[in-house]
């Protein structure tokens, strides 16, 4: 499952942001937090009690993934946004395709990522909090 992070007002990254400091990043709004929790509940309703949950290192993606409540969240660098580093688009998207192609675990895989990565992978635009089964 590809999931765009939940509602985080704005777009792109703030000037001078740091991955280790959420106070320098766009983060989920209260509506985004509620959205993430509601999506997690909906996944449970549809029989997904647990999953392998991977996230980019961006705080809005990590928090989205954590609030789903479907399992421990692991940071996967190939999921990191390339919004400010467009020359890496092709290589990073190829690596993401490889991750999906090589997935062999029986439990579902949930990827919490940014829009630019989703568009690079499948060529469509998901709204905040939208999920896509692949």
Where are these regions (language model features)?
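Active-site-proximal alpha-helix that buttresses catalytic centers in soluble enzyme cores
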Residues: 1-77, 82-86, 94, 124-132
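Internal catalytic-core helix/loop-beta-alpha segment
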Residues: 91-93, 98
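Active-site-adjacent alpha-helix immediately C-terminal to a catalytic or transition-state-stabilizing loop
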Residues: 98-134
């Amino acid at each position: 499952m590809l999931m765009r992070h939940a509602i985080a007002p704005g777009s792109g990254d703030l000037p001078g942001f740091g991955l280790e400091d959420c106070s320098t990043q766009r983060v989920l709004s209260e509506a985004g937090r509620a959205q993430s929790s509601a999506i997690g509940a909906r996944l449970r309703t549809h029989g997904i009690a647990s999953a392998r949950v991977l996230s980019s290192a961006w705080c809005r993606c990590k928090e989205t993934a954590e609030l789903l409540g479907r399992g421990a969240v692991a940071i996967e660098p190939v999921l990191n946004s390339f919004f400010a580093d467009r020359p890496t688009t092709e290589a990073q998207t190829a690596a993401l395709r490889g991750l999906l192609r090589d997935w062999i675990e029986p439990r579902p895989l949930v990827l919490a990522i940014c829009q630019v990565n989703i568009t690079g992978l499948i060529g469509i635009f998901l709204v905040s909090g939208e999920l896509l089964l692949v």
